[in-house]
Design a protein with these regions (language model features):
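Short beta-strand-to-loop junctions in surface cap/lid or active-site-entrance loops
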Residues: 1-2
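Alpha-helical segments flanking ligand/cofactor-binding loops in enzyme cores
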Residues: 33, 114-115, 166
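Gly/Ala-rich phosphate-binding loop of Rossmann-like dinucleotide-binding domains
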Residues: 36, 117-118
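Alpha/beta-hydrolase fold nucleophile elbow
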Residues: 95-107
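Glycine-rich nucleophile elbow surrounding the catalytic serine of serine-hydrolase chemistry
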Residues: 105-117
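Conserved hydrolase catalytic core segment
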Residues: 118-124
């Protein structure tokens, strides 16, 4: 019988020991184990740069790559695409009830939960944990200097999190 499923999106954490990456997901595996023990299918995916997926998450402030924005690149967009592809994979699994797929995550994973729920109607419920701010805090208060680029979505319309929440509705966003 197909089971309800959770797409678990990793936040940020220390991932390399002695130069070897064990993936960011090792810090969150106990969450997936709890979900499995309680009757859910759970897929945990790594974050860009902070696990097994090579790339740069902190490009704008750490590497002064603000030009990325003008070129249409954002690590939030890359994370959203990774989530979409994870949902594509989950749809191929017979143990997954595709009508009951939720998403959650902490920190950066909380931010990705907002993105994927707004972008993909296959998410039936989203439960982001932390990982959000607003445009003023991100830019004016310089929150960007202490967080990675994925925590806020860059967009020409100056949309903020309330607008993203509207895109999730009427599905639950807790």
């Amino acid at each position: 019988e197909p089971l309800p499923t959770v797409l678990y999106l990793c936040g940020h954490g220390r991932v390399k020991r002695n130069g070897i990456s064990y993936g960011n997901k090792v810090h969150y595996q106990h969450h997936g184990a709890w979900l499995a023990q309680n009757g859910y299918v759970c897929l945990i995916i790594d974050s860009l740069q902070l696990g097994e997926i090579e790339g740069i998450h902190h490009g704008t402030y750490r590497y002064d790559r603000w030009w990325w924005i003008n070129r249409g690149y954002t690590s939030a967009g890359v994370e959203a695409w990774n989530c979409i592809r994870a949902l594509d994979y989950l749809e191929t699994r017979t143990e997954v009830d595709v009508s009951r797929i939720g998403c959650t995550g902490r920190s950066g994973g909380g931010a990705y939960s907002w993105w994927i729920a707004a972008l993909d109607p296959r998410i039936s419920v989203a439960v982001p944990v932390a990982g959000i701010t607003d445009l003023r805090n991100h830019v004016i208060d310089d929150c960007v200097s202490g967080h990675c680029d994925c925590m806020y979505f860059v967009n020409q319309f100056a949309w903020d999190y309330p607008r993203v929440a509207q895109m999730v509705a009427p599905r639950p966003l807790m």
